[in-house]
A protein has these predicted regions:
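Short Gly/Pro-enriched turn/cap motifs at secondary-structure boundaries
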Residues: 65-68, 94-97, 109-110, 136-143
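Flexible, small-/acidic-enriched active-site or ligand-binding loops
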Residues: 72-74, 126-155
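Short Ser/Thr-interspersed hydrophobic loop/turn segments at strand-loop and sheet-helix junctions
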Residues: 9-14, 108-110, 121-126, 150-154
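A short core secondary-structure module
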Residues: 85-130
């Protein structure tokens, strides 16, 4: 699947709100760390199930005191005495898909490391507990929960990527998530415009549809112009990324490496697509 095809899917499902949140968290930030950084054994054990939908994934980065400053997280991973397992302790919050996920991508620091390391943690492991679902203003059909890791033991084979490489994994995956969130919002905007136009045609005041009033026309026009601007930003950035992926592949780099380097190159555009 090309990058822009995945952008189009995010756009189409964006109107669904709750489903698009669950879908995006699973196929994006929960699955891509394994796609890009997992070894062959990890991909066979976990990625196959995530891709088929047999397993559901969640991404555990944010903590009560580390949001945008993600690398300041306090979650810890310590080797046990025979160095066969990591023991993870910590708290994660606002975890999309947290309630029903089977696999968690968890970020923690080993001993006194300065940077995070990524780990694959199965929900079935002992020591995992969670708070009730968050009482959100919207997207109530998606799961958002706090997750606690209390002496959770995982085999050393479940470390994802290199030691202290977790922060890099987190940022690269979030860059992809940002631009796809922008594409997802497009779908929501189009749905809102459709509903607004339909209502303006149905609502009658002074014996005419309110769509004939100048103020309503102006509001609808601004909605359309702003949505078109957002669309232009997202798909221009997506096309630039797609072209760079192709360029890097022609240089002999793998698809995964090409995608990562292209996303890194356009990380600012990814952030703009999300914020705008």
């Amino acid at each position: 699947m090309s990058f822009n095809t995945s952008m189009l899917i995010a756009d189409i499902v964006g109107i669904t709100g709750s489903f698009s949140t669950a879908y995006g968290a699973h196929t994006g930030i929960a699955t891509l760390p394994l796609k890009y950084y997992g070894n062959e054994d990890q991909k066979k054990k976990f990625l196959t199930g995530l891709v088929s939908g047999e397993l559901k994934g969640a991404y555990c980065l944010t903590e009560p005191n580390s949001g945008s400053d993600a690398n300041s997280g306090k979650s810890k991973a310590i080797l046990n005495s025979d160095k066969s397992k990591y023991i993870i302790n910590g708290q994660k919050m606002w975890i999309s898909n947290g309630g029903f996920a089977d696999i968690y991508i968890v970020f923690a620091k080993i001993d006194d490391d300065k940077n995070l390391t990524a780990f694959i943690v199965e929900k079935s492991r002992d020591g995992i507990t969670m708070n009730p679902e968050e009482d959100k203003l919207g997207i109530k059909g998606s799961s958002t929960r706090q997750i606690f890791f209390n002496d959770v033991e995982i085999p050393i084979e479940n470390m994802l990527g290199e030691r202290e490489g977790g922060f890099k994994i987190a940022l690269n995956v979030l860059n992809i998530g940002r631009i796809k969130l922008g594409a997802g919002v497009l779908g929501g905007c189009r749905g809102i415009i459709d509903n607004a136009i339909s209502y303006s045609l149905e609502r009658i005041q002074f014996n005419v549809p309110i769509s004939s009033f100048g103020a309503i026309k102006q509001k609808l026009a601004m909605m359309i112009v702003q949505t078109f601007s957002c669309e232009s930003i997202c798909y221009r950035a997506g096309d630039d990324i797609e072209k760079k992926i192709s360029f890097f592949q022609k240089e002999g780099k793998s698809l995964n490496q090409s995608e990562l380097e292209a996303i890194e190159l356009f990380s600012v555009e990814c952030a703009i697509s999300k914020i705008y």
